UniProtKB/Swiss-Prot annotation:
Described purpose of this protein according to its UniProt entry: Component of the exocyst complex involved in the docking of exocytic vesicles with fusion sites on the plasma membrane.
Organism in which the protein naturally occurs: Dictyostelium discoideum
Main location group: other
Gene: exoc4
Residues covered by region (Disordered): 236-262, 376-427, 525-545, 921-968
UniProt-recorded name of the protein: Exocyst complex component 4
Superkingdom of this protein's organism: Eukaryota
Keywords from the named record: Cell projection, Cytoplasm, Cytoskeleton, Exocytosis, Protein transport, Transport
InterPro entries: Sec8/EXOC4, Sec8_exocyst_N, Sec8_M
Subcellular location: Midbody, Midbody ring; Cell projection; Cytoplasm, Cytoskeleton, Microtubule organizing center, Centrosome
Taxonomic classification: Eukaryota, Amoebozoa, Evosea, Eumycetozoa, Dictyostelia
Length: 1182
């Protein structure tokens, strides 16, 4: 064991030894002699003595250890004391020697004072010169250091170094150094260019011009999972870097002792161990010095910047975090004292940047439509051969209403001289080009081109008519909708950046201003002095200062509402072009005078964009425009927007789309949602609720109404509403007035559309009038306007009601025109009308078994009809009947069409309670789903722009059907909103009244046909007056009037089954068989003589009627059987008598019929007088 090793006492072992000895041996009263005697007397005394010996040995060992430990400590104390005395003696000798040297030094100073002062001054000069040279060397490295920091996007450090460098160059020591003049000028120029660069960086980030800005926008959401995760990583990295910096600041580890400060641990160290520790510490210190010398030299200016800048971390790229990046840029501008001018430059660039973004979006949308060959629906009322520069309202009033407006007279489209115009504007039912369909399909002489035009014109005629499906189809492939989606999406991101940047700028400007005011305040306090305490000053109560009041007085320089106003202004100017708003400055025509005084045409109105429309296309076949080549660029390599038009001298346009006031319908809800969304965002960010001075409000019961009494309309919203009031509504009224007049006044208005053109689109295959289809097409278009602009329901509803009422008046006039000259009109205006209405109400029910007894209505009907023919002096003329089958089918088609129109109008415009509940449930489900999506913090990616190729079509369909994330304000109205439902409820009563009018007129047409066919029976059976039944030879052919009646009823029944449903046809012809049976008996009054051949002829008439009218008299043979049996019995007297005695009773024969039969037998003498007496007796018993 080493002698220098310090020994320690083992207290545990000592305690163990002592505890092993019994307690009685530790007591002071221990009697050793008695204990020894007891041991000696004990039988096991030997064992006891051995045990006592062991105890003694253990105690001796521990006693020796205790003595050794204390003796070693005593020796060390004596040794240390001797060393101390030795050090004290050495120190005393050194002190005496130092005192002698001090005396010698004082003597030298007294004798050489002047020389020492000279050396001291020279030393100061050298020191300051070296310091200046060091500064110059550092300043020469500043440009490279600036470029390094700027390249790494560490602009705050760059700004600090730049400002500190210029400040250093302007110090008194360096201001006159000629070698630094060029550097000073370069840094000043660098400062100005650096300001511009910072503003450009901010602009690029705001308008998402770089990939980094787009990525940064995705992570800026506070609820984004990746953003939070990134913040955690950055905080950990910062903590690690801080720890590393802290450890680097101390050159020696904390456990290492300095070689110049020996430690005393309570015991003297040997000389060898001390030298060993000193050598290890020296080696470690040298290694630290070498590592520091190998690191790059840090400039003093750089150290100053790092100590003053706590926001910027040099280890990360700040551009990955948008908010941090903008904060650092603003901080750099603050260092450069360029905040307010930068705000002015940024606000001044908004208009230019938005115009550029709009132009790029226009070009992109146009190229997408070119490359993908999308088909675009036409404007309502536009014909396929409309000119490129014509107004949208001319298409409906002057041309045959093809496309979505209607059809022309002969049911086909007007031909065009252009080789592509015949099929270019037609849209296939399944979205394919008509040229593709026409290759594989032929229907007679008609091509699928015309069929597709009809299917496109009446796209509402689907098998399952659904309101939401109809609305969803309104925004398919509308370029202006896609353009606004892209612009609104871009503007939404840009405006969010502006909001963040405005808050950062305003806070920085406010802090800077408060700092300036605080400095002024402190300066005034110092110059004015304490003065004296005021009476209002109390101890412990802080006195309000001017600095605190100044916080309220500082206004925001970067006004977000001004940004929003500029954005709305630029979008408004773009919309003016696409809405054909001639009040726009962009489209205004200003005449200019040439130097010679003549008027020039340079101010002629011209379109500014290559993309100029939404709904409309002139000549577009889905793949190529006739006026544009396959490439959207000009032959000289320039784009279509930059090409020069030879006629106007201005920028040429790609003539695919046409501006129209109809474009306001699909974009109005988008604008409303967009403006409401950004207004709400602006209010939430600024915390200043806006109020409005206007008191006009729209009354709705929903909370999400577009018009709120407390909301202020922005510039864009005011413009679109003003445009609707000023132009759009009047344009709609005039346009629909012209189109309506054309639809109801054309020669084809009351002709049905060909059946084969509707059978593949309608589950109900009954033809419908052309005018009815066109009127409902108008209602469809106006209904889409109502849904898009629900708070204009009064205006659009008035147009719908006026159009429907005018059509009702036209149909009523047409009905009266056909019915008034006829006998049907006389019967239709009597009390018979209400009986027939009751019969019509139950006609659709199950028919009972045929009965001979007439009902009260049938008796009344038969009486009124027969009275028309009981006046020989007033014979019925042929012109008092409607024998033209086309007129009869027109009445039938009008009845079905008006009833169909009434049902469709009610289905479209009347909101049922179950539908309203369904909409409410759907909205609640959507809100719950949206809340669940918002509660889940998952990363979301924004769709910037429209993809090219096939992906854009899929994304376009997805965007049309759904709305996601922050783009909820951009979207289509695939479902009716609560506002639209409430708006439609205001129209319920007028629409129900109009629908009832249509149904009443439909019933009048049906009743008129029923009466007309019964009058036909009376008219044709009047032939009995001219017929002769004293035939010399047997005749096998029926009477001519029977043949005519057969032909008339058969043709009518065949045509009516095409135009009317089975229940209505049953109502028309249900009583014909019974009526003819009654007439075949009642007309016997005109037969004065008859022989057996005449009887055979009568039987032939009945057989012919029964055979030819089988479709009409299904299950009604009983009415013809009794007549046939009666006629056949006329051949034999006995058979006749037996038959009449058996059958002459009610209800088989009525009293009137019995009287007519007896009179007929008396005149013709077919039986004996006795038989007649027998029959008369039978008649009396009836």
């Amino acid at each position: 064991m080493d002698d220098n090793e310090e020994k320690k006492l083992d207290e545990n072992k000592i305690s163990k030894v002592l505890s092993s000895i019994p307690e009685q041996y530790h007591k002071t009263s221990f009697q050793a002699r008695r204990t020894a005697l007891d041991y000696m007397r004990s039988s096991n005394r030997k064992e006891l003595l051995n045990q006592i010996g062991d105890w003694l040995d253990e105690v001796n060992v521990e006693t020796d250890n205790i003595v050794d430990v204390y003796f070693q400590g005593f020796n060390k104390s004596i040794h240390n004391y001797s060393r101390i005395l030795e050090f004290m003696g050495t120190s005393h000798g050194n002190a005496l020697l130092m005192s002698k040297e001090v005396e010698e030094t004082n003597k030298l100073i007294n004798f050489n004072g002047t020389g020492i002062e000279r050396l001291w001054k020279r030393n100061l000069e050298y020191y300051y010169m070296i310091e200046i040279l060091e500064k110059m060397e550092e300043l020469k490295k500043v440009p490279d250091l600036l470029n390094k920091y700027i390249k790494g996007n560490h602009f705050v450090h760059a700004a600090n170094i730049l400002v500190n460098s210029i400040s250093t160059l302007n110090e008194r020591d360096l201001v006159n150094v000629n070698a630094l003049m060029d550097l000073r000028q370069m840094l000043v120029e660098k400062k100005e260019s650096f300001k511009d660069m910072l503003v450009e960086k901010l602009n690029d980030h705001i308008y998402l011009k770089t990939k980094s800005s787009l990525k940064a926008f995705e992570y800026d959401d506070e609820n984004n999972l990746q953003s939070n995760f990134k913040k955690i990583l950055l905080s950990n990295k910062n903590s690690n870097s801080n720890n590393s910096n802290n450890t680097f600041k101390s050159p020696l580890p904390p456990t290492t002792t300095s070689p110049f400060k020996p430690q005393f641990t309570g015991a003297f160290q040997t000389k060898a161990s001390q030298e060993k520790a000193e050598k290890a510490a020296a080696n470690l210190y040298n290694q630290e010095r070498l590592s520091q010398s190998n690191q790059p030299e840090v400039l003093k200016l750089e150290e100053i910047s790092k100590t003053s800048n706590s926001k910027e971390d040099l280890n990360i790229d700040p551009e990955q975090d948008g908010k941090l990046f903008m904060t650092l840029l603003v901080e750099a501008l603050n260092v450069l004292e360029y905040l307010s001018p930068a705000v002015g430059l940024i606000l001044g660039r908004i208009s230019i940047e938005l115009k550029t973004a709009i132009t790029n979006s226009i070009t992109l949308i146009t190229n997408v439509y070119h490359s993908e060959g999308r088909v675009i629906p036409k404007m309502p009322g536009e014909s396929s051969n409309s000119s490129n520069g014509s107004n949208g309202s001319n298409g409906g009033g002057n041309n045959s209403m093809n496309g979505s407006g209607g059809i022309n007279g002969n049911g086909s489209t007007a031909s065009s001289s252009s080789p592509t115009s015949s099929t270019s504007s037609n849209i296939g039912a399944n979205g394919l080009s008509p040229s593709v369909l026409s290759k594989n399909s032929h229907i007679g002489s008609a091509t699928f081109s015309n069929i597709d035009e009809y299917s496109a014109a009446f796209n509402f005629l689907t098998e399952t008519f659904n309101r939401n499906d109809l609305l969803a189809n309104q925004t398919h492939n509308i370029p202006l909708v896609d353009l606004l989606k892209m612009i609104f999406n871009k503007v939404n991101m840009v405006f969010k950046n502006h909001l963040q940047l405005s808050k950062i700028f305003n806070d920085a400007i406010r802090k800077s201003e408060l700092k300036i005011r605080a400095n002024k305040f402190d300066f005034k306090e110092e110059t004015e002095g304490g003065g004296g305490d005021s009476d209002n000053d109390f101890e412990g109560t802080p006195k309000p200062t001017k600095l605190q009041k100044s916080k309220v007085e500082i206004a925001d320089v970067y006004d977000a509402s001004l940004v929003w106003e500029i954005i709305q202004k630029e979008i408004r100017e773009m919309l003016r072009v696409h809405l054909q708003d001639t009040s726009s400055l962009l489209l205004s025509t200003k005449s200019r005078l040439n130097p010679d005084g003549t008027e020039s045409n340079s101010g002629k109105s011209q379109r500014l964009f290559s993309f100029t429309n939404s709904i409309v296309t002139d000549n577009w076949n889905g793949s190529i425009s006739p006026m544009v080549t396959t490439s959207p660029t000009s032959p000289n390599g320039t784009s279509g927007a930059d090409a020069i038009d030879s006629n106007s001298g201005g920028p040429a346009v790609i003539s695919i789309f046409k501006a129209s006031q109809y474009n306001v319908t699909p974009i109005y809800p988008m604008i409303v949602k967009f403006t409401d969304h950004l207004d709400k965002t602006l209010r939430d960010r600024t915390g200043t609720p806006t109020t409005t001075k206007t008191t006009t409000t729209i009354t709705t019961t929903t909370t999400n109404s577009y018009h709120n009494q407390n909301s202020k309309k922005g510039l864009l919203r005011l413009y679109i509403d003003d445009f609707v009031h000023r132009n759009f509504l009047q344009h709609i009224k005039n346009d629909y007035k012209d189109r309506f007049a054309h639809s109801i006044e054309s020669t084809e208005a009351f002709k049905p559309l060909e059946r084969y053109k509707l059978v593949f689109r309608l589950k109900e295959t009954k033809p419908i009038l052309n005018s009815t289809l066109q009127i409902f097409q108008f209602v469809i278009e106006l209904f889409s306007d109502i849904v898009a602009m629900s708070h204009y329901v009064v205006e659009f509803g008035a147009i719908i009601q006026v159009s429907l009422l005018r059509y009702y008046e036209k149909c009523l006039s047409k009905f009266s025109q056909e019915i008034d000259p006829t006998l049907t009109n006389q019967l239709l205006n009597t009390d018979l009308y209400k009986y027939l209405l009751a019969s019509l109400a139950v006609s659709s029910k199950k028919q009972d078994v045929a009965k001979f007894q007439d009902s009260r209505e049938e008796e009344y009907e038969f009486k009124l009809e027969s009275d028309l023919f009981n006046h020989p002096e007033k014979p019925v003329l042929k012109n008092q009947l409607i024998l033209n089958i086309e007129k009869l089918t027109m009445l039938a088609n009008m009845s079905h069409s008006l009833n169909w129109l009434a049902d469709k109008i009610v289905q479209l415009l009347i909101v049922q309670e179950d539908q309203k509940e369904k909409y409410t449930q759907q909205q609640q489900q959507q809100q719950q789903q949206q809340q669940q999506v918002d509660s889940i913090k998952t990363p979301s990616k924004l769709n910037s722009g429209i993809n090219s190729g096939g992906n854009s079509t899929a994304s376009n369909k997805e965007n049309n059907s759904t709305t996601t994330g922050s783009n909820n304000f951009i979207g289509t109205f695939n479902q009716m909103s609560a506002e639209s439902i409430e708006a439609l409820k205001t129209m319920e009563e007028p629409i129900k009244d109009i629908a009832q009018r249509f149904k009443d007129l439909s019933k009048r047409c049906l009743l008129a046909l029923r009466i007309e066919y019964r009058i036909h029976c009376f008219y044709f059976l009047e032939g009995f007056k001219r017929a002769q039944y004293m035939c010399e030879e047997e005749r096998t052919d029926p009477d001519s009037f029977i043949v005519e009646l057969n032909k008339d009823l058969s043709a009518s029944e065949e045509m009516m089954s095409i135009y009317l449903t089975s229940d209505k046809c049953n109502f028309l012809f249900s009583g014909i068989a019974k009526l003819i049976g009654k007439l075949l008996i009642s007309k016997l009054v005109h037969v004065n003589s008859i022989n057996d051949n005449g009887v055979a002829k009568l039987c032939k008439n009945v057989f012919t009627l029964q055979q030819n009218l089988s479709n009409i008299i299904v299950k009604r043979e009983i009415f013809f059987d009794r007549i046939r049996q009666f006629y056949q019995a006329l051949s034999a007297e006995d058979e006749l008598l037996n038959y009449l005695l058996e059958k002459m009773s009610q209800p088989f024969f009525s009293l009137e019929e019995g009287k007519i039969i007896i009179d007929f037998l008396q005149r013709t003498k077919r039986i004996s007088p006795n038989a007649i007496l027998t029959l008369e007796a039978k008649y009396k018993n009836m």
